[in-house]
C-alpha cells in the first residue's frame, strides 16, 4: 500500500475517497505480536503480582523498625558523632514488641505492628547512594548512574498482563517522587512496559473519557491513527518512544471500558472502607491508593506501585523529625489494611507486598531537629507470595550506624523480589546496544533466608 501522510488521511476522510476501505482491510489483516500477552516466568513463582509501597524521601530506620536505645546512652555519656555534627539524636517514639512476633516497632506504626506475623522485616538494607535522585533510581532501576528500565517494567516484560484492558504496570502517585517518571520508565524495553500513572482526585487518569460524539466514530479514528502510526514506525525501526506512544493509544482505549469500574468504590462494603480508614466519596489519599491497588491486583495488573507522599511533603525529615507523625498516620492504617484485606480474600499467598524507601536517616541531629540522608543502613519489609512470614533478618550496630549482620544490598533486594515472581534475575535480560542488560546488572544474590 502507498505511503499516506496524516494530511492525506484527513483530506481523504473529509472528501470521501476510496482510501478508507483499504485501511479497514489492512486493519483486519495480520496482527502484530502483543507485547503484553501473558508469559510464563523461568519457574513457577509463588507470587503472580506485586504491590510496591514506596515511601519516598527516606524513612528513618531508628525511629520506625530498628530501635536503638544505645543512642540515649551515647547522649548521656556525651559521645559525639564523627564530623561536624552536634550530637546523636535518640528516637522520639516509644518502641514496643509486636504482639504478632515480638519484634519491636515504634508507636508510629501501631497498625503495621499488628501484621508483623505476615512480614519478613529486613533491618540491614544498604543503598549505593546518599542522594534522593540517585538512590530512588537505584531502588527502582538498578543503577544510580544512568537511566535503565524500572523494576516494574522488567516484571511487565517478563510476565505480561492478565487483563488486556488495563496496563500491566500501574503507578498511583498524587505527586511525583524523587527522580520522577524515571522510577517507572521502560527505557530500552518495549514502550508498552512503561508504568501508567494514576494521580487521584476528580480526574485520576488524565483524558480517560472519550471526546468523540460516539464510540463508533472513536473506533474509526483510532483505527486510522494506528495504521498511520505503524507505517511511520516501520520507517523508524528502534524508535522506542514512538512504539510506546502507539501502544498507549491501545491501552487508553481499553482503559476507557475498565478503569472507571476499578476507580468506582461504591460497591465496596462499609466494613472494607472502615478497614482502610476511608469515607464514602474519598478519591485521594494513601488509603484510597491502597484500596485501588487491591482492586487493580484483583483485575490482573502485574505490578502496582503506590507512592506515599502524604501531602506535598514526603519522608525527607531534615528539619523536624516530628513531621513523621503526620506521615505515619497517613499510611499506617491503610498499609495494614491492605495486607489484611488481601489475606481475607485469599490473595496474599500469591501477591507479593513490598514496603520500601530509598535510604534511612542519620542517627545524629541535623539542622534544627531533623536527620540527614543515610544509605549505610535502613529498613524495608516484604510480605505475601514466596516470603517467610514473621521473621526479622539482619542487624545494625548499637547506634544504627552500620550493618552488623547479613547486609542486603538493593540488588539483593531486587533479585529476591524477582525470585518470588518466578525469575532468575541473571536470566531476565534484554539485548540492547550490543549486550544483554538486566535489572541487577552484574550484582545481586537472592536472600534465601527470606523465602518461604
Regions inferred by a protein language model and the residue ranges of each:
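Ligand-binding pockets and gating/stacking loops
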Residues: 1-452
Amino acid at each position: 500500500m502507498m505511503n499516506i501522510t496524516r494530511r492525506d488521511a484527513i483530506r481523504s476522510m473529509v472528501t470521501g475517497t476510496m482510501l478508507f476501505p483499504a485501511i479497514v482491510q489492512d486493519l483486519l489483516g495480520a496482527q502484530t505480536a502483543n507485547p503484553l500477552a501473558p508469559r510464563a516466568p523461568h519457574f513457577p513463582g509463588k507470587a503472580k503480582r506485586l504491590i510496591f509501597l514506596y515511601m519516598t524521601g527516606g524513612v528513618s530506620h531508628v525511629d520506625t523498625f530498628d530501635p536503638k536505645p544505645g543512642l540515649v546512652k551515647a547522649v548521656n555519656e556525651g559521645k559525639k558523632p564523627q564530623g561536624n555534627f552536634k550530637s546523636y539524636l535518640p528516637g522520639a517514639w516509644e518502641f514496643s514488641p509486636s504482639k504478632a512476633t515480638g519484634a519491636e516497632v515504634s508507636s508510629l506504626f501501631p497498625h503495621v505492628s499488628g501484621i508483623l506475623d505476615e512480614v519478613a522485616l529486613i533491618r540491614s538494607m544498604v543503598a549505593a547512594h546518599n542522594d534522593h535522585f540517585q538512590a530512588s533510581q537505584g531502588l527502582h532501576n538498578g543503577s544510580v548512574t544512568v537511566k535503565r528500565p524500572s523494576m516494574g517494567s522488567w516484571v511487565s516484560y517478563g510476565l505480561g498482563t492478565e487483563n488486556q484492558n488495563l496496563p500491566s504496570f500501574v503507578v498511583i502517585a498524587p505527586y511525583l517522587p524523587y527522580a520522577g517518571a524515571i522510577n517507572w520508565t521502560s527505557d530500552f524495553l518495549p514502550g508498552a512496559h512503561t508504568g501508567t500513572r494514576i494521580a487521584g482526585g476528580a480526574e485520576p487518569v488524565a483524558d480517560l473519557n472519550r471526546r468523540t460524539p460516539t464510540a463508533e466514530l472513536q473506533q474509526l479514528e483510532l483505527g486510522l491513527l494506528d495504521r498511520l502510526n505503524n507505517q511511520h514506525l516501520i520507517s523508524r525501526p528502534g524508535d522506542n518512544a514512538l512504539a510506546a506512544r502507539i501502544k498507549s493509544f491501545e491501552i487508553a482505549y481499553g482503559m476507557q471500558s475498565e478503569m472507571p469500574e476499578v476507580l468506582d468504590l461504591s460497591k465496596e462494603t462499609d466494613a472494607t472502607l472502615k478497614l482502610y480508614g476511608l469515607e464514602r466519596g474519598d478519591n485521594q489519599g494513601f488509603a484510597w491508593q491502597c484500596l485501588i491497588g487491591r482492586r487493580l491486583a484483583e483485575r490482573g495488573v502485574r505490578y502496582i506501585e503506590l507512592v506515599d507522599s502524604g501531602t506535598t511533603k514526603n519522608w525527607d525529615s531534615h528539619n523536624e523529625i516530628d513531621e513523621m507523625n503526620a506521615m505515619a498516620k497517613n499510611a499506617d492504617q491503610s498499609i495494614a489494611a491492605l495486607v489484611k484485606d488481601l489475606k481475607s480474600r485469599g490473595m496474599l499467598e500469591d501477591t507479593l507486598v513490598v514496603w520500601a524507601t530509598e535510604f534511612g536517616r542519620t542517627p545524629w541531629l541535623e539542622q534544627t531537629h531533623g536527620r540527614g540522608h543515610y544509605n549505610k543502613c535502613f529498613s524495608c519489609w516484604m510480605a505475601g507470595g514466596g516470603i517467610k512470614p514473621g521473621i526479622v533478618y539482619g542487624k545494625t550496630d548499637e547506634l544504627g550506624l552500620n550493618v552488623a549482620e547479613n547486609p542486603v544490598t538493593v540488588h539483593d533486594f531486587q533479585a529476591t523480589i524477582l525470585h518470588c515472581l518466578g525469575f532468575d534475575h541473571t536470566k531476565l535480560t534484554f539485548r540492547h546496544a550490543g549486550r544483554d542488560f538486566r535489572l541487577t546488572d552484574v550484582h545481586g544474590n537472592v536472600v534465601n533466608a527470606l523465602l518461604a
